[in-house]
Amino acid sequence: MFDLGWTELLVIGVVALIVVGPKDLPKLFRNVGRFVGKARGMAREFSRAMEDAADEAGVSDIQKTFKTATNPMGSAMDSVKQATRDLTDSIDPTKFDPESETGKLAADRAENAKKIQAATARAAADRMAREAAEAAAKAEEAEAALSATPASTASSDSETKA
């Protein structure tokens, strides 16, 4: 909003500490925080009111029409996405009659899909556990090598001094 970096904020904080003093500084920051919060709330409320007014006036419909006119490829993709959504909604297994053959098959498919998802999740968890164990083993090897290295360098240092 004000495009202030950390260094600018630090300078402002130091100046505020000098001007206000350490005793009243927390109160000042609290009041500034409240003010900023209220200002953001008012800005959000204003934006929401403007969007509501635009929706009531039909600006969003006009905007959609302009978008369609200026970007025919995007509007075609939007219609494809909408058709896909409609198709997936129509295939939803919960919408079939559970007593019909289609409903029974859909329920079986949904159950099998859940089993597959559970097996996949279990396999992923096993793989992650295996990788974590391998990483821990590598870390232990590295620590062992690291602890062995100073001892060998210390003995070589004593040999060079003698």
Swiss-Prot record:
Q: Per the record's keyword annotation, is DNA damage included, yes or no?
A: no
- The primary location reported for this protein is membrane
Bilayer-crossing regions = 1-21
Q: Which residues form a coiled coil?
A: none
Q: How does it sit in the membrane?
A: Single-pass membrane protein
Top-level taxonomic group: Bacteria
Is Magnesium there in the keyword field? no
- Keywords on record: Cell inner membrane, Cell membrane, Membrane, Protein transport, Translocation, Transmembrane, Transmembrane helix, Transport
Molecular function as annotated in GO = protein transmembrane transporter activity
Q: How does it assemble?
A: The Tat system comprises two distinct complexes: a TatABC complex, containing multiple copies of TatA, TatB and TatC subunits, and a separate TatA complex, containing only TatA subunits. Substrates initially bind to the TatABC complex, which probably triggers association of the separate TatA complex to form the active translocon.
- Official protein name in the record: Sec-independent protein translocase protein TatB
Naturally occurring in which organism (per UniProt): Ruegeria sp. (strain TM1040)
